[in-house]
A protein has these predicted regions:
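Residues that form generic nucleotide/phosphate-binding pockets
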Residues: 70, 74, 91, 95, ...
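Solvent-exposed loop/turn segments at secondary-structure junctions
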Residues: 38, 138-141, 173-175
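Noncatalytic regulatory segments and standalone regulatory/sensor domains
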Residues: 20, 145, 155-198
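Conserved catalytic or regulatory cores that recognize and/or transform ribose-phosphate-containing ligands
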Residues: 45, 49, 99, 140, ...
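Hydrophobic, well-structured mid-protein blocks that either form specific transmembrane helices
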Residues: 75-111
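Active-site-adjacent substructure of cysteine-protease-like catalytic cores
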Residues: 112-167, 197
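Active-site-adjacent structural segments surrounding the nucleophilic cysteine of cysteine proteases
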Residues: 1-87
Length: 198
């Protein structure tokens, strides 16, 4: 069984691309803000919100970067990174409040939970048509080295036999990962997921 959310492209990029930001701090540490920007565009396209102040008919990097700078104060890049789920919820929640959007609620799903429970939560979100922000801190598997201390979105899954593959979106591209391998980091300090209600 496979399900992927409809998504969007920005001048050929699959979603926003942090590495192309003109602003140095956003380029280096703006991953949380970028996932929030992507969620806003997604919600406008598919959930009838009104969060992205530019045209949705033809998404451009220039306007996306401008939007990213509007999001930056809420999910500000910092020395330690946005390394807790609650910081993300507080920052993005403040943005939503300031933009008169009370339809979207968020709750944290700790990376300390069992992978089986995390898979269930992920599948439920995707089945509801909702992207899932994911925070990965350190990981023992070097497959995920470009995703360490990083926020990205999960936008699809594929289930077969005992395996669950997940579609991760970041850096303007998408990747398929084994969810158990992604979730079981081998480190005591964990990230986790953000679950939306809308």
């Amino acid at each position: 069984m496979r399900k992927e959310l409809d998504y969007f492209k920005i001048e050929g990029d699959y979603g926003g691309n942090q590495e192309l930001f003109p602003d140095l701090m956003m380029k280096l540490g703006g991953c949380a803000a970028v996932t929030a920007c992507d969620c806003c565009i997604y919600f406008d396209l598919y959930k009838e919100t009104n969060l992205y102040p530019y045209s949705l008919d033809r998404l451009t990097r220039k306007e996306y970067f401008q939007f990213g700078m509007k999001m930056k104060p809420y999910l500000r890049p910092r020395w330690t990174g946005i390394d807790k789920l609650e910081i993300y919820i507080d920052g993005f929640g403040e943005f939503l409040c300031d933009h008169n959007c009370n339809r979207i609620k968020m709750r944290p799903f700790s990376g300390e939970a069992e992978a089986t429970n995390a898979k269930t939560a992920l599948v439920e979100q995707i089945d509801k048509g909702l992207p899932v922000p994911c925070l990965l801190l350190n990981h023992k598997n070097k497959t995920f080295k470009d995703f360490e201390w990083h926020w990205f979105l999960l936008t699809g899954y594929e289930l077969f036999e005992e395996k669950c593959m997940v579609k991760a979106v970041s850096y303007g591209e998408w990747y398929w990962f084994d969810f158990d391998e992604l979730w079981n980091t081998g480190h005591s300090r964990k990230g986790g997921l953000i679950l939306f209600e809308i």
